[in-house]
Each structure stands twice: as structure tokens, then as C-alpha cells.
Amino acid sequence: MVEISDDIQVLSHELHSSKLEYLGAIRGIRSWCKEFGERQKMEIDFKDDVSRLVPLEIGLCLFRILQEALHNAIKHSGVKRIEVEIAEHGNEVHLEIKDSGRGFDLEAVKRGSGLGLTSMRERARLVGGTLTLESKPMQGTSIHVRVPLKAKAGASAA
């Protein structure tokens, strides 16, 4: 029972975005990655190269995609190290998440009914961005998100 309570508390904390509001998008995401890595006993190699302020709605979009991707990696990849990079490229911000785990057959996932990939793509689309995925069995997975630094009007990725 205590374990369930702890899990609910962690989930509630993860769903709350006040850390992004308080620290700013990039620092908030970095802080969350550190905490998540410690909780999951895995190394998250976080790098960022963003000089501009990332609007909260874009930061929240990237944060939610990252959460889903890291939870999927924990569940399916079998790795203890994941690379996360957020970088500014012109008028876009890019998020890349890479692991060297089990990987999977993309066609099989497209035919499946899982909501994770669909929700990540939809979040990116809502702020005018795109999400691409590369994976092959036994060769790891790479997720690349590109979002314009100016979000679409009225967008919400929460």
C-alpha cells in the first residue's frame, strides 16, 4: 500500500508543471531529468544549447514528450543510459532522445494501438512542430522533435 502511495505521489509531482514555470523550460526539464534518473537508477546524459527563453507552452510540450519517451525507454528498452539534447537551431528548438536499447519494428508499432507515440506526435503538432522516430530491433531508438520557437496561437500541450 505504501508503494502505491509513493507511486501516486511521484506521478502527481511529474504531472505538475510549476517547476517549468519557476525555473524556466530548459532548467526545469534538466532538473526533472536529474530527479527521474536518480529515481530510476539510470544515467540521463542531458545537454542543452539554447540561448533564448523558450515559451512555457513549448517547454511544456517538450517536457510531456520527454516524459513519455523516458517512461517508454524504462519500460521497453532495457538500457541504463539515455541521451537527451535540447538545442536551438535558427528559429526552432530541437529535442532529441536516444537510447541504445532493444529498439523495435516501426511498422509493427504503427499497426499497434498504443497511444504513447500518437500522443507525442499530437503534442508536437499542437505547437506547430514535428516528431520523427527511428528504431530498429536491437539497434536502439531515436526520437527527434522540432518545434518553432513561436508556438501556434492558442496552443496548449498540457
Residue ranges and their predicted role:
Residues 1-158:
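Coiled-coil dimerization/phosphotransfer module
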